[in-house]
Amino acid sequence: TASLQYLSVLAVAAVFLQLTFGALMRHTYSGLSIPDFPLAYGQIFPSLSNDAIASYNYQLILEGIKWTGDKPVAAYQIFIHLLHRYWAFIVAGIITLLGFRLLALKSLPKYLRNTGYLLLLIVTIQFTLGIFTVLSRKEYITTSFHVVIGALVLVICVITSLRIARLRWLNKYFGYDEK
């Protein structure tokens, strides 16, 4: 279970970093800098040139997301938004892998295997909420649930990692099998 322990610690670190990117996005007002999903202004990696940024700002005004008097979206805001968005795919992959590994290891206690189902469910909910946060133009209920579920994902990953570490410790020093 050493590799499982490393994977669970990686999940904790990845989720923590994702929450940091989310906080950075919130505090730099980057949440509405990209109005579409799955692409960003119709591209995987939108241009951050001055002309492109001017075009994006005009598009945001036409779509009613920004007003002409609002501060225009800057390249750094789009970059931060993309960082949070694309890192989410990596985090979802790590948590999905951890969830399936927990389910596959029949030697694990039932509570740890069941945590695999919980991880798969919660990462699916969180990913879906992230998509709807963008598509709803940061509607406050959707956005609030996205933030709360993000914190819950971190808590579940930390507890899972601690449970795996405890199991490894008990097995190593006492030959204890917690089935």
Feature-to-residue mapping (PLM):
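Polytopic transmembrane helical bundles with strong interfacial aromatic enrichment
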Residues: 1-179
